């Protein structure tokens, strides 16, 4: 991994690395925050998945998470949201193509050559992190919007691999809303059964489980009613007896002003779960 940025932050280092991804067949950037204790010991890892139009920079520059990661001794890994490059398929819209990988494995041309974000996040990136950084095998996952969707899907499909999962403003029923329907049709084809593998509410209804889900949702979020539908997740978790910590916040929108307001509580939540044995 090639170091391309290095910034001192809260006694640790906010770095950005570039590497070639075998899963995605392109160069990828990834933000890695190493707290002070990483100098002398191995630490657990929180993976953060960002939303539509984002890259590795949004979370590391806007959330203020470094303060809390340093306090709780957690390495934070923030990858890009899709494969990148002039040779990678793209679309002339913000919600499909580069910047909109949806954390799935595409099966349809032209997307299936590079868009394997599920494999990248689940397998390739953790292996790189374990090899290059002082990381233990303990990991949790979180994200925002499209990234919240990705975090929920990865945790629900691999409950033994993640100590905890949380999300800000996640797309919880992508097969039922425009963002998800458009992306899934392009990436996965018209067989809607294939879509359900990447739909958190559907996965839970089929019996997939995690111990607990934490979600924060702003009630002034312009996308809440049409695209996010947090109440669908709350309802299915109640029906399936999955413990939740779902909080609704008056006045908060879909932006990083919202994420930065509550990221400290999410990191504390994950720290507690990561330190349990």
UniProtKB/Swiss-Prot annotation:
The keyword ATP-binding appears for this protein: no
SUPFAM superfamilies (UniProt xref): alpha/beta-Hydrolases
UniProt keyword annotations, A-Z: Hydrolase, Serine esterase
One Pfam family from the record: Esterase
Top-level taxon of the source organism: Bacteria
Gene Ontology biological-process entries: formaldehyde catabolic process
GO cellular component terms given for this protein: cytosol
EC number(s) per entry: 3.1.2.12
Protein purpose: Serine hydrolase involved in the detoxification of formaldehyde. Hydrolyzes S-formylglutathione to glutathione and formate.
NCBIfam families cross-referenced by the UniProt entry: fghA_ester_D
Family (UniProt): Belongs to the esterase D family.
Record protein name field: S-formylglutathione hydrolase FrmB
Organism (species): Escherichia coli O6:H1 (strain CFT073 / ATCC 700928 / UPEC)
Originating gene: frmB
């Amino acid at each position: 991994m090639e170091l391309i940025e290095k910034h001192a932050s809260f006694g640790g280092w906010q770095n950005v690395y570039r590497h070639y991804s075998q899963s995605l067949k392109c160069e990828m950037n990834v933000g890695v925050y190493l707290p002070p204790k990483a100098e002398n010991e191995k630490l657990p890892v929180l993976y953060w998945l960002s939303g539509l139009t984002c890259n590795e920079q949004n979370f590391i520059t806007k959330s203020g998470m470094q303060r809390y990661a340093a306090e709780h001794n957690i390495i934070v890994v923030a990858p890009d949201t899709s494969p990148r490059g002039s040779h990678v398929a793209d679309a002339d819209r913000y919600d499909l193509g580069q910047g909109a990988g949806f954390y799935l494995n595409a099966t349809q041309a032209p997307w299936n050559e590079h868009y394997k974000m599920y494999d990248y996040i689940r397998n390739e990136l953790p292996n790189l992190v374990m090899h290059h950084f002082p990381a233990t095998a303990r990991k949790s996952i979180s994200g925002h919007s499209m990234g919240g969707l990705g975090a929920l899907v990865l945790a629900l499909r691999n409950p033994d691999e993640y100590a905890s999962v949380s999300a800000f403003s996640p797309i919880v029923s992508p097969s039922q809303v425009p963002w998800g329907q458009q992306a899934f049709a392009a990436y996965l084809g018209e067989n809607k059964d294939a879509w359900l593998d990447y739909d958190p509410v559907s996965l839970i209804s089929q019996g997939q489980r995690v111990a607990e889900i934490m979600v924060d949702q702003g009630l002034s979020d312009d996308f809440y009613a049409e695209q996010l539908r947090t109440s669908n997740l709350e309802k299915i978790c109640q029906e399936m007896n999955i413990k939740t910590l779902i909080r609704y916040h008056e006045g908060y929108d879909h932006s990083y002003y919202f994420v930065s307001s509550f990221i400290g509580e999410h990191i504390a939540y994950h720290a507690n779960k990561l330190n349990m044995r």
